[in-house]
C-alpha cells in the first residue's frame, strides 16, 4: 500500500506546510464544531438506517484519525480558495512562474511532497483498514481532479482577458468603415451635383460647401470656406463633364476604361453601379416634394437600374437621410429669403394658385411650406 502512494505523481516540495499538517492530523478528531447541518470537512449529520450512534461516531473517528485526512482537508481547502478567491492575471496564469498561486495544482503537488516527507517520519501512510485507505485515496484524487479543472478555467479566463484587452488597444474596424463612408458620401454628392444642372445655384453651392466640411453623412452641415468651396466646385465640374459625356454617348472611346475603373471601385467599396445611382438620383430630384417611390415605381426603377427592389428601397432610405434631410436643415438655417424649394424654383415664383408643398423625411417630422414661404412642422 505504501508503494502505491509513492508511485503517485509528485511535484517539487515545500516545507512551510509541514508543521501545520502535523498539528492538523493530531488535533482534527477533537476540534470542536459549530452547530449546524454542515460543518467544514464534515458530512451532514444524517444517520443511516441500521447504524446506531456509537458505530457512526466510531467510523467518523476512524476517518478523522486517518493519516491521510490532513492531506484530504488541505486539498479541499485549496478547492474552496480556487473557487471563491479573486484571481489576478498579473499574479497567476499569464507570465507567472509555476506554483506561484497558493491555490494552483502545482502548489498542491508541492504540499504532497512535503506531507509525504513529514508523515513517513512519524507513522505509516495507511491504516489497518484497506477499505478506509482506498476511500481516502479516491477522495483525494477526486478533489485533485477538481482542482485541475478549476485551474484550467482560470487559465482560459486569463487568456480571454489578455486577448480582449489587446484587441481593444488596436484600431477598431469601425474606424475604417467611417473613413470609407465619408469618401463614398463625398463622391455621391459630386456626381449628383454634376448630373443635375437644373438645380438652383443655392443648392449647388450648398453641396460644394458641405463636401468641404465633411459632415454631409451625418446630416449636420458645417461652415464653408471660400477657397475650399471654389476648388471643390472646379473638381466637381470636371467630374460632372466626364459623367455627362459618358451618359450621353455610351459608345465613346473611353467607355470601356471608365467601366473597368468603376468595377474596381465598386468591388472595393461595395457600392451600386454609377449608371444605376444616376437614374435613382434623377428620380429623387424630380420628386423632391414627395421622395417616396411607390411599389410600382420601385419595380420600374429596379428594372431600369438592374438592381433588386430591396436595393432600390435601401438606396432611397439612405438618400433621404443623407441628401434630402441635410438640404432641409440648411434651408431652415438660411431663413425665409433662401428657403429650400423642392421644385427648384425661387420662392418669389409662388402664387396663391400654387398648392402647398410638403416634404417628409424618414426619422423626422414632416415640414410644410405655405404660400408665404414659411416652414411649419406637421
Swiss-Prot record:
Gene3D superfamilies, alphabetized: Homeodomain-like
Region (Disordered): 24-57, 203-265
Annotated InterPro entries: HD (IPR001356), Homeodomain-like_sf (IPR009057), KN_HD (IPR008422), PKNOX/Meis_N (IPR032453), TALE_homeobox (IPR050224)
GO cellular component: nucleus
Annotated Low complexity bias: 230-244
Location within or outside the cell: Nucleus
Compositional bias (Pro residues): 32-43
Annotated region of DNA binding: 265-327
Major place of residence: nucleus
PANTHER family: HOMEOBOX PROTEIN TRANSCRIPTION FACTORS
Family of this protein: Belongs to the TALE/MEIS homeobox family.
Protein name listed in UniProt: Homeobox protein Meis3
Lineage: Eukaryota, Metazoa, Chordata, Craniata, Vertebrata
